[in-house]
Structure formats: structure tokens, C-alpha cells
Swiss-Prot record:
One of its GO terms (cellular component) is extracellular region. The keyword Methyltransferase does not apply. Residues 1-21 form the signal peptide. Belongs to the neurotoxin 10 (Hwtx-1) family. 65 (Jztx-21) subfamily. Expressed by the venom gland. It comes from Chilobrachys guangxiensis. GO terms for molecular function: ion channel regulator activity; toxin activity. This is U14-theraphotoxin-Cg1b. The presence of a 'disulfide through disulfide knot' structurally defines this protein as a knottin. Probable ion channel inhibitor.
Amino acid sequence: MKTSVLLVILGIAAITVQCTASESVEQDSLRTFVDAVLGWNAEMASEARCGGWMAKCADSDDCCEAFHCTRFNVCGK
């Protein structure tokens, strides 16, 4: 009787650990996907602000590199 109760408890513990581990993997992959989408949206918004890849920014001392306005000397110009 004691052995069967112990086996049931160990079985429940094993199932709980397995379910918890699979939930964390699913959450990590979902978080990675959401971060990728949000990062892409931020890059597109930044590109619109500086006029596109390697475009000139409003300040003549800046240029657009990697979707961000930076100083010309940083851009190699």
C-alpha cells in the first residue's frame, strides 16, 4: 500500500515537472516572436523618421544608418 501511494505521488510530481517545463518553452518561443515583431515595427517607424536607408536627416550633420539618424563622421562620410 505504501509503495503504491509513493509511486502515485512520484508520478504526479513527474507530470507536474514535465508540464511546467513545456509551458516555459512555449512562453520563451512566444516571447521571442513578439520581441521580433515589436523590434521590426520600431525599425520601420525609425526608418520613416529619417527617410530610409542611408538617407539624409533633417540636420545636415546627420545621416540615416541602420534606421537611425547619426552623425556623418559615424556614417563614414
